[in-house]
Amino acid sequence: MPAKTPIYLKAANNKKGKKFKLRDILSPDMISPPLGDFRHTIHIGKEGQHDVFGDISFLQGNYELLPGNQEKAHSGQFPGHNDFFRANSTSDSMFTETPSPVLKNAISLPTIGGSQALMLPLLSPVTFHSKQESFGRPKLPRLSCEPVMEEKVQEQSSLLENGAVHQGDTSWGSSGSGSQSSQGRDSHSSSLSEQSSDWPADDMFEHPASCELVKSKTKSEESFSDLTGSLLSLQLDLGPSLLDEVLNVMDKNK
C-alpha cells in the first residue's frame, strides 16, 4: 500500500461539511521502524559546488549537472573532477553568499568524487608545515670544522717544507759532492711523504665532525620531541575516581 494513501479510522458516513482531523487519518502503522545508524552523508544544495559535501562519485565526473554550474561548464570555467572541495562555513572565499544551515553541522565532511573517494582530508597543513621544516636535510658540519682543518693542513705542509730544506742544508754542509746531497734530500722527502701518507685521514675530521654531528642530532631530537609532545599533550580529566571514595570509607571504618 502506498504511504500517501490515507487510512480512515472512523466510518465514512459522517456529517456533511465536517472534515476529517489529522489524528483521524494517521495511524501507528505509518510510523517507520528505527533505521539504525542513519546519517546525512550526502548533500547537494542549490548553490552547487559551494553547497555540497559527501560522496558524490555517483555523478561520474559530470559536475556540470550540479545546480548553478551549467553556465560555467559551457564557458569552460568549471574545474576538473579531481578538484577537492571542502564545505566549511567559516571560510569567506567559499561562502560569499548565505550558506546552507545544514553545512554548519557538516564542517568536517569532505566532498569526495572519482579517484579521491578513498582519500582522507588533510589534517591542519598550516600547523605541520613549521614542524616539517625542522626535519629537513641536515646541514653538513663544515662551518666550525673548516678552521681546524686548514690549520692542520698548513702545519703538515710547513713540516714537509722545513724537513726538506733542513735535510738539504745538512747534506750540503756535511758532504762535498752534490750527488750525495740530492740523494739524501730525495730520500728524506720520500720518507716524509710516506709518513704523511700513512697518517690516518680520520684524525683531521674526527673530533670536529663528531661534535658538530652531535649538535645536529640534538637539534633533530629536540624538534622531534616538540612534535611528539604537541601530539601527545592531550589529557583527559575524568574527575575523581570511585576508588578514592572507597578507600576513604575504609580508612574511616578503621
Swiss-Prot record:
InterPro entries from the UniProt entry: Cdc42_effect-like (IPR029273), Cdc42_Effector_BORG/CEP (IPR051296), CRIB_dom (IPR000095)
Modification Phosphoserine occurs at: 89, 108, 144
Single Gene Ontology BP annotation: regulation of cell shape
Keyword Methyltransferase assigned: no
Species name: Mus musculus
Region (Disordered), start-end ranges: 165-205
Function: Probably involved in the organization of the actin cytoskeleton. May act downstream of CDC42 to induce actin filament assembly leading to cell shape changes. Induces pseudopodia formation in fibroblasts.
Gene name of the encoded protein: Cdc42ep3
Places the protein is found: Endomembrane system; Cytoplasm, Cytoskeleton
Residues annotated as domain CRIB: 31-45
UniProt topology in membrane: Peripheral membrane protein
Residues with Phosphotyrosine modification: 63
One Gene Ontology CC term in the entry: cytoplasm
PROSITE patterns linked to this entry: CRIB
Compositionally skewed regions (Low complexity) per UniProt: 171-197
Family label: Belongs to the BORG/CEP family.
Membrane-traversing stretches: none
Primary location group: membrane
UniProtKB keywords: Cell shape, Cytoplasm, Cytoskeleton, Membrane, Phosphoprotein
Taxonomic lineage of the native organism: Eukaryota, Metazoa, Chordata, Craniata, Vertebrata
Subunit-structure text: Interacts with RHOQ and CDC42, in a GTP-dependent manner, and with SEPT7.
Protein's name according to its UniProt entry: Cdc42 effector protein 3
